[in-house]
């Protein structure tokens, strides 16, 4: 009987833990420093598990680069007062973000300042 109770307890624990929300780390981003970017919002995706902004950034050379900015979840952004109307495609914004460790044009978005001049937390 003790053995059966242990097995049932283990099965219950395994079942419950499978419903526990999981999340990946930010280990692929350089979390100790911010990159400052200014550019034009080309795409905005307010989707879960993370919102995404695609930002067209003009380099000193005149070349344009597309950056992918990973933001927080839609629920977290909503708690911070951010929604689909906070910024618009075509709007020029400045951001502070944590770049990917491999140097690729991707960031974990920290702060975004829109044309209204208000800096908002996007993580």
Locations of the language-model features?
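Short aromatic-glycine-enriched beta-strand elements
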Residues: 47-58
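Short boundary/loop segments of OB/S1/cold-shock single-stranded nucleic-acid-binding domains
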Residues: 20-35
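Short, structured beta-strand/loop micro-motifs enriched in basic residues and often containing a Trp
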Residues: 71-79
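Sec-dependent signal peptide recognition
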Residues: 2-10
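Conserved hydrophobic positions within beta-strands
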Residues: 39-41
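Short nucleic-acid-contacting surface segments enriched for D/E, G, S/T with interspersed K/R
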Residues: 79-94
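OB-fold/S1-family single-stranded nucleic acid-binding modules
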Residues: 100-123
């Amino acid at each position: 009987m003790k053995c059966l109770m242990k097995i049932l307890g283990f099965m219950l624990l395994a079942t419950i833990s499978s419903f526990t929300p999981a999340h990946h780390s930010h280990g692929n981003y350089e979390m100790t420093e911010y990159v400052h970017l200014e550019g034009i919002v080309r795409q905005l995706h307010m989707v879960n598990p993370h919102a995404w902004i695609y930002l067209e950034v003009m380099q000193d050379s005149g070349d344009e680069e597309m950056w992918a900015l990973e933001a927080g979840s839609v629920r977290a952004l909503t708690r911070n007062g951010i929604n689909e109307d906070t910024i618009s495609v075509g709007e020029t914004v400045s951001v502070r973000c944590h770049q990917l460790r491999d140097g690729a044009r991707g960031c974990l978005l920290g702060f975004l300042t829109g044309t209204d001049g208000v800096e908002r937390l996007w993580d």
